[in-house]
Amino acid sequence: MLQEEDIEERLNMHNTLLDKAVGWRRVAGPGIADWARAAAPVAINIVTASTEPWRCGGTWFVGLDALPNDAAGRIAGAALPWDELGLEPVALHRAQVSVVRAGYPQPSASESDAAFRFRLNRDSAHLDGLIAEGPNKRRRVVEPHRWIVGMALNEADAGASPLVVWEGSHRIMRDGLLAALRDVPEAEWGAVDLTDVYQAARKRVFAECTRVVVPGRVGEAVVLHRLLIHGVAPWAEGAQAAAPGRSIAYFRPVMGSVAEWLSE
């Protein structure tokens, strides 16, 4: 297991441009800090006033499209600092406000025992955009995201259910999915059931890729490759976070096609 100093050294490696070998980076800047300070009180008010049920036994507020930012990412007068993020501006959806409380995860009626064990033991590791549908939870590409950006909105201990990533997993996922789609016309890729190949590729990720814990810090952003396997660690005993819980705003703008999604 990585020690705290090893984690810090690894995180510092990713304060520059996204390394294609690992698939993620962390950046910081005054504009990111200003954006988080502007978004935080808005997010807190939304979460505390919301009637949306908390999942995972009352420990996770999903908060999809909860933040009322504009299409440029501006919120409460604060502009999204595209230059600090190192990204080209694109039209944005309302940000997700994901909030986790102490005790995460807990069993719930909406989740099977197997799904809960996977959440507890494997951080509910997943690939965004590959959505499970129907009673049999078969997966296809529904939301081909361009990239994923997460920005911490409040102070939280490193053990307060941090983001976790599997370095290099985007390459394994891309190779596996492309192999499954090789003989399918590109226009039909979004309709293909990719459940089995996805699960096989994810199993390989667990065996071959390094799991890295990425605690959120106000004033910093984490940029993930769209195909990177990632998840949320269980809340560590004794970890603390400001109310209403460890809070992160996420942007995942959608691309034009599945073929584009599977490009480099």
Question: Where are the model-predicted features located?
Answer:
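Short, Φ-rich (hydrophobic/aromatic) sequence segments
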Residues: 1, 152, 251-255
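Fe(II)/2-oxoglutarate
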Residues: 1-35
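Non-heme Fe(II) oxygenase catalytic core, chiefly the N-lobe of the double-stranded beta-helix
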Residues: 17-20, 34-211, 235
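Short hydrophobic/aromatic beta-strand or adjacent loop that forms the aromatic wall/cage
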Residues: 22-24, 146, 246-248
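Non-heme Fe(II)/2-oxoglutarate
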Residues: 178, 223-264
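Short acidic-glycine-tyrosine-enriched beta hairpin
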Residues: 210-223
